[in-house]
């Protein structure tokens, strides 16, 4: 036994928003597509309530236009939209890392995420890496102690940003390597280094997402 703890997941509305945001950014759901509450809920295996809440989150992001008849229309996504999204995430998550260091936060849950992912990837098991990745970021937001920042970052979450020419395993290994650098800086209580490593990590994800548009 490795003594690892369960991975924590985001609330349902953020998971739904993440799945939809990723599909819209990667163009799996095209501009102009109509999404209904019932069909989206059925496809994602959730109730209608978190889908309705996710529609509102994505409407605030400018990705959906919510209609009165329980549906939403996918709006166009541009390079500018993607850059602004990731630049905001980089700024907020970099600050979250700094707060972890400045507050001398307990890093045990963050370490658990790194160790669990490392064990899985050592056997080339990538099936659950989406959850490991999500939990790593979530635990940093939690450890920052800033509840408003955590809530905003939860709504901004969009999961893995795998580029068009990258395999799932290569992406996971690259992401995990970056996570280990972030954790090492957090463990050293180096606020500036942890912020820099996190910003680099998020902006690399931005570059991967932009491969669908450039």
Locate predicted features.
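Short helix-capping and inter-helix turn/linker motifs at the boundaries of alpha-helical repeat units
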Residues: 11, 107-108, 170-174
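Short linear motifs at protein or domain termini
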Residues: 1-102, 210-214
């Amino acid at each position: 036994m490795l003594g690892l703890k369960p991975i924590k997941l985001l609330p349902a509305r953020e998971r739904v928003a993440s799945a939809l945001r990723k599909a819209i950014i990667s163009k799996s759901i095209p501009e102009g597509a109509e999404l209904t509450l019932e069909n989206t809920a059925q496809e994602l295996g959730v109730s209608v309530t978190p889908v309705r809440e996710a529609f509102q989150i994505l409407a605030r992001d400018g990705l959906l236009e919510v209609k009165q008849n329980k549906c939403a229309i996918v709006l166009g996504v541009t390079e500018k939209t993607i850059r602004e999204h990731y630049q905001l995430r980089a700024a907020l998550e970099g600050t979250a890392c700094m707060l972890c260091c400045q507050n001398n936060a307990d890093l045990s849950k963050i370490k658990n995420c790194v160790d669990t992912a490392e064990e899985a990837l050592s056997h080339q098991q990538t099936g659950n890496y989406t959850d490991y990745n999500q939990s790593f970021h979530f635990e940093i937001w939690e450890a920052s102690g800033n509840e408003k920042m955590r809530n905003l970052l939860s709504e901004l979450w969009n999961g893995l940003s795998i580029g068009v020419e990258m395999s799932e395993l290569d992406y996971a290994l690259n992401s995990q390597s970056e996570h280990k650098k972030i954790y090492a800086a957090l463990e050293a209580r180096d606020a500036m280094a942890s912020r820099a490593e996190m910003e680099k990590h998020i902006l690399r994800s931005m570059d991967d997402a932009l491969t669908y548009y450039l």
